[in-house]
Amino acid sequence: MAEKAAEKAEQRAADEAEKRPVEDGEKHSGRKRRRRNYDEHDEAVAKDDAQSAKAGAAADSDADDSDADDEKLEVLMAREEEDEDDLAEIDASNIISGGRRTRGKVIDYKQTAEELAAEGAAAGVDDDAEDADADFDGEG
C-alpha cells in the first residue's frame, strides 16, 4: 500500500512539472476584475442603425428604379418571344389523311388481323404460359 501511495505522489509531481509555471503577476494583479461595460458600444450601434436607416430610404428609391427596369426588361423579352414564333400556315401536303401513319407503306389492317388469328390458331397452345409455369417448377 505504501508503494501505491508513492506512485501516486510521483504521478502528481510529474503532472505539475508538465504544467506551465504561474508567474506572480498572473496570479494576483491586485485589482478587482469587473465585467466589461457595453453601454458605449450599444450607443455606437444605435447611431449606426440611425445612419443606415437614412441611407436605406435612399436605397429603397434605387430599388424601386431597378424594379421598374426589371419590368421593362420583361416586357421587351415577351415581345421578342412573340416575334420569334413562326406562325406560318400548315402545309396541306404534310397532313396524313388515311388513318394511321405507316411510313409510306399501305397496310390492310383487316388482312393483318386475319393472318395473326390464323397463326395463333395454328400454334395451338400459348407458349408463354408454359414458360411461365416452368420457371416455378424448380427448373432453371
Swiss-Prot record:
Subcellular location: Nucleus
GO BP of this protein: chromatin remodeling
GO annotations of cellular component type: nucleus
Keyword Chaperone in record: yes
Domain of life: Eukaryota
InterPro entries for this protein: Histone_chaperone_domain_CHZ
UniProt-recorded Gene Ontology molecular function terms: histone binding
Residue ranges with Basic and acidic residues bias: 1-28, 37-51
Stretches for region Disordered: 1-73, 118-140
Segments of skewed composition (Acidic residues): 61-72, 125-140
Chief localisation class: nucleus
Disulphide linkage map: none
Keyword tags: Chaperone, Nucleus
Subunit relationships: Forms a heterotrimer with H2A.Z-H2B, stabilizing the association of the histone dimer. Also, with a lower affinity, forms a heterotrimer with H2A-H2B.
Protein family membership: Belongs to the CHZ1 family.
Function as written in the Swiss-Prot or TrEMBL entry: Forms a chaperone-bound H2A.Z-H2B complex that acts as a source for SWR1 complex-dependent H2A to H2A.Z histone replacement in chromatin.
Protein name listed in UniProt: Histone H2A.Z-specific chaperone CHZ1
Species whose genome carries this gene: Eremothecium gossypii (strain ATCC 10895 / CBS 109.51 / FGSC 9923 / NRRL Y-1056)
Encoding gene per record: CHZ1
